[in-house]
Amino acid sequence: MTQVYDGFVHLGFSNRNGRTISHKKYQEGNSRVSADNSDANGVPYYFLINMGGGFVEGEQYQVTIDVNKDAHALVTTQTPTYVYKCEKGQLTQQNTSITLEENSYLEYMADEVIPYLKSRYFQTSRIDMDKSAHLIYSDGVTAGWSHEDLPFQYHYFRNLTQIYQDNELVYSDQTLLEPEKQDMFKLGYFEGWRNYNSLVMVSPNIDEAFVKALQKHLEGLNLESDFAISSLDISGLVLRILGKTAEDNRRIIYSCADYFRQEIHGLTPLNLRKNDMRR
């Protein structure tokens, strides 16, 4: 590693005799990882932890995850990502790099970003995956935090997520929010809501029939958020959610992940041991 980061995590997973093990766990700076053994299916389950409680102005973080052939791992954040104010105008950054080999399966369930007053934040995620691999990837952003509890007091938020299959760019999604320049409540932005989340699922098992069945499944739930599902040009889908609370949005995300787990892989529902989980 040539660049110096304020926090760095590298996780690697391999299949050994039909069982996934963590063959690499590296952590430095403000970043830590913690294992949890609560998954009933025996899937390695890790929390990403920031020891400082949040990201300080100008800090840079890196998360690298490698999932080898036939391995399955679950990675989530312990808490939302708090981005503190940037009084000097410096950009705070986090980069995530994910590699998925043949028939591997990663569930990356990140909590939303909560930008503080005057904060500036840029997040990039690059996923390189084999066409036979399976991916569940979620993230989000809120209206932020300020002492006066006023929404959208941050200066700059940018989130770029790109997925490559066999070195070809197949999905690119960018969220750019500059509340001082944009009306965050109008159509196409938050539309009166305070929380936005997205979920991307890519798998050779996802087709139009699966997408329609998932849509019907979600419509049968008592949900308080607005959501929409779209099929991708590849075998996959993207779910976008606007809601009053992050907890309401996460309920939809977990429901989608559970549906995929059960219908495609025959696994039990997620148990992320989060305080807002409502089963």
Swiss-Prot record:
It is found in: Cytoplasm. One of its GO terms (molecular function) is nickel cation binding. It holds the Pfam family UreD. Keywords: Chaperone, Cytoplasm, Nickel insertion. One of its GO terms (cellular component) is cytoplasm. InterPro entries: UreD. It comes from the Bacteria. Belongs to the UreD family. UreD, UreF and UreG form a complex that acts as a GTP-hydrolysis-dependent molecular chaperone, activating the urease apoprotein by helping to assemble the nickel containing metallocenter of UreC. The UreE protein probably delivers the nickel. Required for maturation of urease via the functional incorporation of the urease nickel metallocenter. This is Urease accessory protein UreD. The lineage of its organism: Bacteria, Bacillati, Bacillota, Bacilli, Lactobacillales.
